Amino acid sequence: MAARRGRAKRRKVCYFTANGITHIDYKDVDLLRRFISERGKILPRRVTGTSAKYQRKLTIAIKRARTMALLPYVAD
């Protein structure tokens, strides 16, 4: 059987743990936009590499920002 060839998967690192961010503020729209798709959906952990703890905080912050009309619910 032939050996599988391809790129070695790079371990994704949590952005918040790596940069020492402990509080995710819903008013920091530039940070939150990094974790939203072009369609306006929240990107999953397997795509972003965010840890479970910070993914929960991130989700709450994004939903709060949407409620305050800082982020759109859907893309234009």
Curated annotation (Swiss-Prot):
One GO process term, biological-process aspect: translation
InterPro entries in the record: Ribosomal_bS18 (IPR001648), Ribosomal_bS18_CS (IPR018275), Ribosomal_bS18_sf (IPR036870)
Record key words, sorted: Ribonucleoprotein, Ribosomal protein, RNA-binding, rRNA-binding
GO cellular component, one term: cytosolic small ribosomal subunit
Source organism, top-level taxon: Bacteria
GO molecular function: small ribosomal subunit rRNA binding; structural constituent of ribosome
Functional description taken from the UniProt entry: Binds as a heterodimer with protein bS6 to the central domain of the 16S rRNA, where it helps stabilize the platform of the 30S subunit.
Assembly notes: Part of the 30S ribosomal subunit. Forms a tight heterodimer with protein bS6.
Similarity remark: Belongs to the bacterial ribosomal protein bS18 family.
Protein's name according to its UniProt entry: Small ribosomal subunit protein bS18
Organism, as annotated: Oceanobacillus iheyensis (strain DSM 14371 / CIP 107618 / JCM 11309 / KCTC 3954 / HTE831)
Organism taxonomic ancestry: Bacteria, Bacillati, Bacillota, Bacilli, Bacillales
